[in-house]
């Protein structure tokens, strides 16, 4: 069969650009004309031309922001979407590159941003989906699936523990439940917490938010209230859960801070609620808990927006700056010493520290010779 662009006397070529699945677009006739005037256009050369033109068109359609921060945000969003849409084998390979520690009992990874741990409505791919594939990549085709030992929120990055055996996973889960695992999170906050160090001990419960955007949020359920300047104990809500968070400001600027958080308890969204509603310092990029009455992009001061190089209309693209920085596991299984695991910050988190003028603390202090310290790659 002759190539479609070869001209035949008395035959008029018709454009099919308006039809779905078209072979030619209006711009493709130019190279067909020039090509046929010099030498025949065979099927291979035609395919190469069409492929090059398609790539060129796709490059033109991608709008690259001129602002560096907007470019980083766009890259983050695109990378997150790709992680949820890739083939499970590709995601498992990405997680294998993020392994922080591996032994006969455990595999510890540096969880990426925007990746759910469990499936649910609207979730195309999650970490639990690819654990069987990851296990086979690490231990061969006969390997049993890895098991989750705990969970992190979709937007939270950092240390995440997996176990080879179900029994070991239950043992680690019991350590978390009985508060024998020491956890440290880092967060960038909007405004600076006062005092600079302390303990937030306020119960938390889930509550329905009335209004045009009816939804549910976790909120504070205080055991005390102020009455004429005195603290008066109130009846505890049956739905409230004890929630305790230790915090310390590591670095601060005029309108933001780097805060280290140690959750004593493990209630849903505990750190976000205690910072936002307990200390009035929401986490940067927390578009859910920055305002109680509605779900809307976080409102930032003009000074903060200027430092980030963003306009308020682009604030919705700012990711949640909450990172599971460090985990200390007691001796367990084949290990005779505790294991200290430290994860480096995501690129977007480190860049925000730089832009906001927040200093990185010195290298975390080790816990002595009995602790085995592992630093994330």
Curated annotation (Swiss-Prot):
It is found in: Mitochondrion matrix; Nucleus; Cytoplasm. Belongs to the pseudouridine synthase RluA family. Its main location: mitochondrion. GO terms for cellular component: mitochondrial matrix; mitochondrion; nucleoplasm; ribonucleoprotein granule. Catalyzes uridine to pseudouridine isomerization (pseudouridylation) of different mitochondrial RNA substrates. Acts on position 1397 in 16S mitochondrial ribosomal RNA (16S mt-rRNA). This modification is required for the assembly of 16S mt-rRNA into a functional mitochondrial ribosome. As a component of a functional protein-RNA module, consisting of RCC1L, NGRN, RPUSD3, RPUSD4, TRUB2, FASTKD2 and 16S mt-rRNA, controls 16S mt-rRNA abundance and is required for intra-mitochondrial translation. Acts on position 39 in mitochondrial tRNA(Phe). Keywords: Cytoplasm, Isomerase, Mitochondrion, mRNA processing, mRNA splicing, Nucleus, rRNA processing, Transit peptide, tRNA processing. It comes from Mus musculus (Mouse). GO terms for molecular function: mitochondrial ribosomal large subunit rRNA binding; tRNA binding; tRNA pseudouridine synthase activity. This is Pseudouridylate synthase RPUSD4, mitochondrial. One of its GO terms (biological process) is positive regulation of mitochondrial translation. The active site is at 153. InterPro entries: PsdUridine_synth_cat_dom_sf, PsdUridine_synth_RluA-like_CS, PsdUridine_synth_RsuA/RluA, RluA_PseudoU_synthase. Its EC number is 5.4.99.-. It catalyses: uridine in 5S rRNA = pseudouridine in 5S rRNA; a uridine in tRNA = a pseudouridine in tRNA; a uridine in mRNA = a pseudouridine in mRNA. Residues 1-46 form a transit peptide. Pfam families: PseudoU_synth_2. The keyword Mitochondrion applies. It comes from the Eukaryota. Interacts with 16S mt-rRNA, mt-tRNA(Phe) and mt-tRNA(Met). Forms a regulatory protein-RNA complex, consisting of RCC1L, NGRN, RPUSD3, RPUSD4, TRUB2, FASTKD2 and 16S mt-rRNA.
């Amino acid at each position: 069969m002759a190539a479609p662009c070869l001209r035949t006397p008395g035959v008029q070529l018709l454009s099919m650009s308006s039809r779905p699945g078209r072979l030619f677009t209006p711009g493709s006739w130019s190279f067909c004309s020039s090509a046929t005037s010099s030498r025949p256009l065979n099927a291979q050369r035609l395919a190469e031309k069409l492929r090059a033109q398609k790539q060129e068109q796709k490059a033109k359609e991608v709008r690259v922001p001129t602002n560096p921060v907007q470019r980083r945000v766009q890259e983050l969003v695109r990378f997150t979407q790709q992680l949820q849409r890739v083939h499970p084998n590709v995601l498992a390979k990405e997680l294998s590159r993020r392994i922080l520690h591996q032994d006969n009992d455990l595999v510890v990874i540096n969880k990426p941003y925007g990746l759910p741990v469990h499936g649910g409505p609207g979730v195309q791919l999650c970490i639990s989906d690819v654990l069987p594939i990851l296990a086979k990549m690490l231990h061969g085709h006969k390997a049993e699936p890895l098991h989750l030992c705990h969970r992190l929120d979709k937007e939270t990055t950092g240390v995440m523990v997996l176990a080879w055996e179900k029994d070991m996973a239950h043992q680690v889960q019991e350590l978390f439940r009985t508060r024998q695992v020491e956890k440290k999170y880092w967060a960038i906050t909007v405004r600076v917490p006062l005092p600079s160090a302390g303990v937030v001990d306020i119960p938390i419960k889930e509550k329905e938010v009335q209004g045009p955007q009816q939804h549910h949020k976790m909120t504070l359920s205080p055991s005390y209230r102020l009455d004429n300047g005195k603290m008066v104990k109130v009846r505890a809500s049956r739905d409230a859960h004890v929630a305790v968070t230790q915090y310390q400001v590591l670095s601060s600027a005029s309108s933001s801070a780097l805060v280290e958080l140690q959750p004593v308890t493990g209630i849903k969204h505990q750190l976000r609620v205690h910072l936002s509603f307990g200390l009035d310092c929401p986490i940067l990029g927390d578009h859910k808990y920055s305002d109680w009455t509605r779900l809307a992009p976080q409102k930032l001061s003009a000074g903060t927006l200027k430092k980030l190089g963003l306009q308020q209309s682009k604030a919705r693209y700012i990711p949640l700056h909450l990172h599971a920085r460090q985990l200390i596991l007691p001796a367990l299984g084949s290990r005779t010493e505790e294991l200290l695991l430290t994860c480096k910050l995501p690129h977007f988190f480190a860049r925000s520290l730089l832009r906001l003028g927040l200093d990185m603390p010195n290298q975390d202090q080790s816990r002595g010779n009995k602790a085995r310290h592992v630093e994330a790659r």
